[in-house]
Amino acid sequence: MQSPIRHDWSLEEVEALFALPFNDLLFQAQVTHRRNFDPNEVQVSTLLSIKTGACPEDCKYCPQSGHYNTGLEKEKLLEVEKVVNEAKAAKEKGASRFCMGAAWRNPRAKDMPYVLEMVKQVKSLGMETCMTLGMLTADQASELAGAGLDYYNHNLDTSENYYGEIITTRTYSDRLETLQNVRDAGMKVCCGGIMGMGESARDRAALLAQLANLPSHPESVPINMLVKVKGTPLEVQEDIDPFDFIRTIAVARILMPRSHVRLSAGREDMNEQMQAMCFLAGANSIFYGEKLLTTPNPEADKDMMLFKKLGIRPEQREQAHSEDQQEAYLHDVIQAHDQQQRMESMFYDATKTA
């Protein structure tokens, strides 16, 4: 039985979830997760920076901002062929989704034809496509949707109340407008935030409430842990407590039960035990590879070793091209479902009352 979808969460309700005893919160999140997903599958995505550095925005966490001296080498927009080759390599390593990010305030008209061609060619590989290019007009969103872009990433970063402490060059309403343009164009939304930027527990609750109360939940919700980069204003920010981060994952899972909750930036600084707790709390998506745009990420082989230890497998994006393939795929799905049913029959759901 899938969990009901709500869009009317009060801040007090969300704060009450954060305040639950840790074990109770994780139990509730895990039950919600199992009702909506295979608990042992994790979506694997790869992220490529297609244009690096010299961004005019002043996001205090970002090494790509032109406002700070972080030593980052600027790069122009990559050639389409190079992007496609990177996507092929990612697919060979097990990625089912390929995400492309550009350090822009918004895409310029002269760059759009190249960006659209990237989408078309990566899509032709049988991969899901995602982009993050900054703010979008309604027309730009329609162009991307027409090229076949599946997802558009545009994070809210933090609560509306704390937002001005982190970014001043674009408003919270600017971000919400881009999200609406993406939705109106028919694309799926990838939207989350960054934890550990000095925000309060109430700010974390407010961010998740904002996401859960959107007209449609984001299909992907990246929960990032701040990566402190030398030269940015947040380089000396105090670390977030790991339990507070795991709580954020768990509450996101409960509020948005059918969304992929992505364990995103910051994994390089998490040990295996913390990552395992995040998966238990409902995270079921990761970025895979050695870099997230410009910050380190666990090596792909380390991820697969962790998956093996935990009995986790990558989520597959199946594309059957013949009746035989379709029949084989359906047979595998039925077998997996039967196995899951047998496993569930060995346990009882303590959340159900007689």
UniProtKB/Swiss-Prot annotation:
Cofactor or coenzyme needed: [4Fe-4S] cluster; [2Fe-2S] cluster
SUPFAM superfamilies: Radical SAM enzymes (SSF102114)
GO MF, one example: biotin synthase activity
A GO biological process held by the record: biotin biosynthetic process
InterPro entries xrefs: Aldolase_TIM, BATS_dom, Biotin_synth/BioAB, Biotin_synthase, Elp3/MiaA/NifB-like_rSAM, rSAM
Protein role: Catalyzes the conversion of dethiobiotin (DTB) to biotin by the insertion of a sulfur atom into dethiobiotin via a radical-based mechanism.
Name the UniProt record assigns to this protein: Biotin synthase
Biological source species: Hahella chejuensis (strain KCTC 2396)
Gene: bioB
Keywords recorded for this protein, A-Z: 2Fe-2S, 4Fe-4S, Biotin biosynthesis, Iron, Iron-sulfur, Metal-binding, S-adenosyl-L-methionine, Transferase
EC number: 2.8.1.6
Database matches in PANTHER family: BIOTIN SYNTHASE (PTHR22976), BIOTIN SYNTHASE, MITOCHONDRIAL (PTHR22976:SF2)
Taxonomic superkingdom: Bacteria
